[in-house]
Every structure is written in C-alpha cells, then in structure tokens.
C-alpha cells in the first residue's frame, strides 16, 4: 500500500493510531516504568528465587515463582515510585537523577503518586490472593519501611540513612521464603542479615562517587559528612559482618560445600577489595569506589546463585 501524500487527511479508521499519538503514549509508558526503577528491582529479585528454592528444598511450582516475582516487582515499583514523588525536589539537584520523569515534568506528581499507590494495592492483593497473606503483610511492610522510615524519615536527616533504611531492600528474602512456607524461618532471617550488611558497602561506594551530588541536594550520606578514611573503615567493618553471616547460613540452613566454598571465596574476594580501599584511603590515594560498587553486585548475584545450586543438589 502506498504511503499517503503529504498533507493528506489522517485515516478515519479507528484501529489506526496516528504516529505522534503512539509515540507520546510510548514515551508516557516508558516514563511510568522509569519511576519504578526496574534496574534496582532486578537486583532485589536476584535474592528471591534462590530463597524460594531453599525453602522448597527443590523447585517450587513455576506458577508460584512467576506470581511472586511479578507481585514483588510491583511492590518494589510502588515503593520506588513514591520515593520519586517525595524526592522530586532534590532529584533535580543531582546529576545522577535529574533525568527522572518527575524532574523533566513528563509525569504529573499527583499522577505519579496515584500510580505508586495503585501498584502497592495491586501487589498486596496479588500476594494475598495468589500466594499467601504472610507475604502480603511483608510486602506492605517493605513499602511502608522504605517510604516512611527511609525516604521521609532518615534520608535527609541522618548519615545512618542507608544503614537502617536499607532494611527495606532485604524484604524480598523474607517474602521468597514465606511464599513457599507461609512463615519466616531462621535461614531467611540470616539471609536478610546478609543483604542488610551488604547494603552499606554497596551504597556508600556509590555515594563516594556521587558525593558532590548528595552534598548539593543536602542529603547527609556518610561520604558527605565523614572523611574518606572513616567511610572506607565502615565499609570494611560491614564487609566482615556480611561475610560472617553468609557463612553462618550454611549450618543453619543445612546446606553443604556447594554453597559454603563459593561463600568463602566470594567473601575473601570482597573483603580483600574493601581492605584495598581502606588502605588507599589512609594513604590519601585514589580508591576507585565504583569498582567495589560493581563487585558488590557480582558478589550478591553469585552468592545467591550458589545458594540456589545448593538447594537443588
């Protein structure tokens, strides 16, 4: 079919969507998805499936895995969207966040808030009706903790913001366990602690890199209010705690060398990098914080992959 001539009347066919309208709709959908911060959600969900495998001591039903992941994505997306709504004033001051939809005004603040609340309601109903109500309660707790304790409470007030507030990112571990068992067991509690102690090194490394952004926005992240030597010592301390708890998972969860050997090797690798950072900071040398940031993602991914392997073997 030949293309219509320039200046021709647009089609009256109701099934044909004008290109401009389609492009605007696509951009709008992308903006709402961007509010959910799916790249962050992806990291959170890395821990969910391995914990489900451990709780089941095998492979749970694909239906349960799919529903849990979808509901978990919507739950985390709800918390992230509301976070974007609350932080829209400081996001415009930070180079890392100034392209977010609310800063660019491609989504109205009220619409973003309604979207975030709707995601939370849908995820809660999905967990409650399709998984179990224990998981639903944990999901609501995660959203509430992230929004009220971290975003509204600690983020702009305390250098310990990410230490305490980061607990919200640990809830997928508990939800993964409860989705299978309907309860929260000790292995899940220890894995929660692994992610809890992992969070400060992960985010402080990022905050070192974007220290000026946080300072401009008035967010008292530890690298803004403390010396680099102090920050790297804290990173090292939390790294040791993280590794110690990760090793304690093996006897408590009754899993063997398939998990323990990788946990030891990964832990040694991570602690060695944390030591390197602390030593270079003490000498006043460049520390390359993003190296630890990316290593932390690899560490957590491989640790939970080892957990999944141990659960299946």
Curated annotation (Swiss-Prot):
Matches recorded under InterPro entries: Protohaem_IX_farnesylTrfase, UbiA_prenyltransferase, UbiA_sf
A biological process from GO: heme O biosynthetic process
EC nos: 2.5.1.141
Membrane topology: Multi-pass membrane protein
Known pathway: Porphyrin-containing compound metabolism; heme O biosynthesis; heme O from protoheme: step 1/1
Leader sequence segment: none
Keywords: Cell membrane, Heme biosynthesis, Membrane, Transferase, Transmembrane, Transmembrane helix
Family note: Belongs to the UbiA prenyltransferase family. Protoheme IX farnesyltransferase subfamily.
Comment field (misc): Carbon 2 of the heme B porphyrin ring is defined according to the Fischer nomenclature.
Described purpose of this protein according to its UniProt entry: Converts heme B (protoheme IX) to heme O by substitution of the vinyl group on carbon 2 of heme B porphyrin ring with a hydroxyethyl farnesyl side group.
Protein name: Protoheme IX farnesyltransferase
Protein source organism: Parafrankia sp. (strain EAN1pec)
């Amino acid at each position: 079919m030949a293309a219509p001539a320039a200046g021709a009347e647009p089609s009256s066919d109701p099934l044909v969507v004008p290109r401009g309208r389609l492009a605007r709709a696509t951009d709008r959908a992308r903006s709402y998805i961007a509010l959910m911060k799916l790249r962050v959600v992806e990291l959170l969900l890395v821990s969910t499936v391995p914990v489900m495998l451990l709780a089941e001591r095998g492979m749970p039903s694909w239906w349960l895995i799919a529903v849990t992941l979808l509901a978990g994505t919507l739950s985390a997306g709800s918390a992230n969207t509301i976070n974007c709504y609350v932080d829209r004033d400081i996001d415009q001051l930070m180079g890392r966040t100034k392209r977010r939809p609310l800063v660019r005004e491609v989504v109205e603040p009220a619409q973003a808030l309604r979207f975030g609340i709707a995601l939370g309601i849908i995820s809660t109903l999905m967990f409650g009706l399709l998984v179990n109500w224990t998981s639903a309660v944990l999901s609501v707790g995660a959203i509430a903790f992230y929004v009220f304790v971290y975003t509204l409470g600690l983020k702009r007030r305390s250098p310990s913001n990410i230490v305490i507030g980061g607990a919200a990112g640990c809830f997928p571990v508990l939800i993964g366990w409860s989705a299978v068992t309907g309860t929260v067991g000790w292995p899940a509690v220890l894995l929660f602690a692994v992610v809890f102690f992992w969070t400060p090194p992960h985010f402080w490394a990022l905050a070192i890199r974007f220290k000026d952004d946080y300072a401009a926005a008035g967010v008292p992240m530890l690298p803004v209010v403390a010396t680099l030597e102090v920050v790297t010592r804290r990173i090292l301390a939390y790294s040791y705690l993280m590794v110690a708890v990760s090793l304690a998972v093996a006897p408590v969860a009754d899993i063997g060398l398939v998990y323990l050997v990788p946990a030891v090797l990964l832990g040694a690798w991570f602690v060695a990098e944390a030591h390197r950072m602390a030593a270079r900071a003490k000498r006043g040398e460049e520390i390359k914080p993003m190296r630890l940031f990316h290593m932390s993602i690899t560490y957590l991914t491989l640790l939970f992959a080892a957990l999944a392997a141990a659960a299946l073997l």
